[in-house]
């Protein structure tokens, strides 16, 4: 009696599973980079929103918001900083009078100086001294571009370069 076997051999099944695994890996890698690009696009839009809010504040008050009181009560915080991943951002929002966007990942922990950390957050710094209220720095970091950014400061300050992120510098025309 001659019986023909119907079905798949173990080797054929293993080959199919291996091919599916390879395809799944490629698809997941593509989705991951697409998510990073989408978060970066949101970051760039958020930075523009925050800049617009700062300019409106400047028009109404003749100065940018001082962040000297924003970080009070936060251990090891620089008194001129506001970081979107800790309580100082809420104080910044209160001072601005609006709700400001937060980074899509928003995972910085530590002392408030996110440039020394590896997480993602927005970081507002009101410059003190003669520049108080006339200049600010707004830092952000992209996932798909790790190059630093920089700009020449005002009020007699030299160039400021972010070692782990980009930043924009705003200043009043008279500043």
Where are these predicted regions, by residue range?
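N-terminal alpha-helical signal peptides/signal-anchor transmembrane segments
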Residues: 44-62
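A generic fold-level signal
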Residues: 5, 42, 131-133
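Active-site micro-motifs of SAM-dependent methyltransferase domains
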Residues: 33-36, 56, 66
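Extracellular/periplasmic head regions of type IV pilus-like filament subunits
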Residues: 59-142
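Short, surface-exposed interaction loops/tails
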Residues: 130-175
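N-terminal single-pass transmembrane signal-anchor helix
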Residues: 2-31, 35, 39
């Amino acid at each position: 009696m001659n019986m023909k076997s119907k079905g798949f051999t173990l080797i054929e099944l293993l080959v199919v599973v291996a091919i599916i695994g390879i395809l799944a890996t490629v698809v997941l890698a593509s989705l991951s980079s697409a998510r990073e690009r989408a978060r970066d696009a949101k970051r760039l839009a958020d930075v523009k929103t925050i800049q617009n809010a700062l300019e409106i504040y400047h028009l109404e008050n003749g100065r940018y918001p001082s962040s000297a009181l924003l970080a009070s009560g936060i251990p090891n915080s620089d008194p001129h900083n506001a970081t979107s991943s800790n309580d100082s951002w809420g104080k910044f929002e209160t001072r601005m009078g609006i709700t400001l966007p937060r980074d899509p990942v928003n995972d910085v922990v530590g002392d408030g100086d996110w440039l020394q950390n590896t997480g993602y957050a927005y970081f507002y710094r009101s410059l003190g001294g003669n520049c108080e209220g006339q200049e600010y720095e707004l830092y952000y970091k992209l996932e798909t571009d790790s190059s630093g950014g920089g700009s020449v400061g005002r009020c007699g300050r030299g160039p400021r370069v972010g070692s782990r992120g980009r930043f924009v510098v705003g200043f009043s025309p008279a500043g």
